[in-house]
Amino acid sequence: MDTMQGESNIVEIWTDGGCKPNPGPGGWAAILLYRGTEKELSGFDPETTNNRMELTAAAAALEALTRPCKVVLNTDSEYVRNGITRWKDGWVRRNWRNASGDPVANMDLWRRLLDAAARHEIDWRWVRGHAGNPMNERADQLATKARMEG
């Protein structure tokens, strides 16, 4: 998604991901909003987990931005929000090990997300899923459609 230099470059993103059963076939989706323009992204993985789909949605959304932006990224995944805002520094300091000394789960996608986030200024916001938020519900519908249609 392109932004014009010198103009407000705040992009609002809504992401969701899931699979059924977990693990199993999964889908992810992201909706990017910028100055009245919307872009929808979605994808499918035949064998995955909910957390991997949530991470993929956030990474893909940020990768779609063609220039550094100010971003408000809305996710209903506490795993994604806590990982990026609270846990990542410790993981990196411990060479991608968690507090128990075990390798961080989904390390490949966490690294992808960190790379995608590096050039942006991001406000990571958690929203309650399935609580009637129209954009969260829409992202959920797109992710479910991607999962169902493969």
UniProtKB/Swiss-Prot annotation:
Q: Which PROSITE patterns match?
A: RNASE_H_1
Chain sites annotated for binding Mg(2+) 1: 16, 54, 76
Requisite cofactors: Mg(2+)
Q: Does the keyword field hold Cytoplasm?
A: yes
Sorted alphabetically, the keyword list is: Cytoplasm, Endonuclease, Hydrolase, Magnesium, Metal-binding, Nuclease
Query: Where along the chain is Mg(2+) 2 bound?
Result: 16, 140
Q: Can you quote the record's cofactor note?
A: Binds 1 Mg(2+) ion per subunit. May bind a second metal ion at a regulatory site, or after substrate binding.
Matching InterPro entries, A to Z? RNase_H, RNaseH-like_sf, RNaseH_domain, RNaseH_sf, RNaseHI
Top-rank lineage group of the source organism: Bacteria
All copies of domain RNase H type-1, residue ranges: 7-148
Q: Can you list the GO cellular component terms from the UniProt entry?
A: cytoplasm
GO process annotations (BP): DNA replication, removal of RNA primer
| Catalytic reaction equation(s) | Endonucleolytic cleavage to 5'-phosphomonoester
Q: Where in the cell is it found?
A: Cytoplasm
Could you tell me one molecular function GO term of this UniProt entry? nucleic acid binding
Protein family per UniProt:
Belongs to the RNase H family.
Q: Which NCBIfam families match?
A: PRK00203.1
Assembly and partners are described as:
Monomer.
What is the protein's known function? Endonuclease that specifically degrades the RNA of RNA-DNA hybrids.
Stated name of the protein:
Ribonuclease H
Native species = Granulibacter bethesdensis (strain ATCC BAA-1260 / CGDNIH1)
